[in-house]
Amino acid sequence: MIIAAYLVLINLCGFWVMGIDKRKAQQHKWRISEDRLWLIAIVFGALGVWLGMQTFRHKTKHASFKYGVPLLLVIEAILIAIYYSPFDL
């Protein structure tokens, strides 16, 4: 239950941060560092970051985000599936 709540919160955070960074880019204001965006994605927020990328059309031309976030999302999905698997792997 706690893990599921964490996953929801970190992915909401990832989505929100991508929206904020896009808006700040349009306004030519301070930006959220790519390192911070990657950190959120790496700590199981890749789904939220990816959804934010698609929704806000942000970082979609950066190869590291374009290919890295979906790859990280697949890895995270596999790890979560293994964790919640009823089988002893």
From Swiss-Prot:
Disulfide bonds: none annotated. The chain crosses the membrane at residues 5-25, 36-56, 67-87. The keyword Oxidoreductase does not apply. InterPro entries: DUF1294. One of its GO terms (cellular component) is plasma membrane. The keyword Cell cycle does not apply. Pfam families: DUF1294 (PF06961). It is found in: Cell membrane. It is a multi-pass membrane protein. It comes from the Bacteria. Keywords: Cell membrane, Membrane, Transmembrane, Transmembrane helix. This is Uncharacterized protein YsdA. It comes from Bacillus subtilis (strain 168). The lineage of its organism: Bacteria, Bacillati, Bacillota, Bacilli, Bacillales.
